[in-house]
Amino acid sequence: CQYLSKRPLFLFPVAGSASRGVALICSPADLKHEYDEPMLVQEALQGDEYTINIFIEERGVMRGAIPHLRISVRAGEVEKGRTVRRADFDAIARNLAASLPGARGVLCFQLFDDPKLGPRVFEINARFGGGYPLADHAGGHFAENVLRTAIGMPLVASHDWQDGLTMLRYDSAVFL
């Protein structure tokens, strides 16, 4: 890449998903004159990619943050991931929760741990992430807490979850 402003840029549809329509922009020549939909541009980051699932209780207190390394991704969905306990990721999750005073329930965000820049958040979603089953199996219990909140029961989410748990996804065919 001939770096545009020293680092390449990442271009993707605002309403996109599953890695549809993404492009790496290394020079002005990589840009089209027009796009069929609104596009978002951000700095292209390097390094390992992580998703952090968090649970924020009714008073706005973060009750759990479970990061997982996205070891292998297919069509935007993690197919191999591993939980990773890191104090810096927990601090980022706490700061994010504090920066979103109205946020409640389950959120997820993604970051790259860029070797030059350090961890950089690039996406925040007010929903369960696609890799949430890994966080749940590791001890997050966030879905259970959504239900407990709705019926007024005490929460079970905590910071006590299994580090180093690996999840593998696979496809199977069914013939009728």
What do the predicted segments below correspond to?
Residues 15, 46, 126:
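Short, glycine/acidic-enriched loop or turn micro-motifs at the edges of active sites
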Residues 13, 43, 66, 123, ...:
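Pocket-edge structural micro-motifs
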Residues 8-28:
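Conserved anion/nucleotide-ligand pocket segment
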Residues 1-5:
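Glycine-/Pro-rich loop/turn segments that contact NAD(P) or position catalytic residues
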Residues 87-176:
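ATP-dependent carboxylate activation and anion-phosphoryl transfer catalytic cores
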Residues 6-8, 38:
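A general structural motif
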Residues 18, 49, 129:
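Conserved protein kinase catalytic core
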Residues 21-102, 108-120:
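Phosphate-binding site of ATP-dependent enzymes
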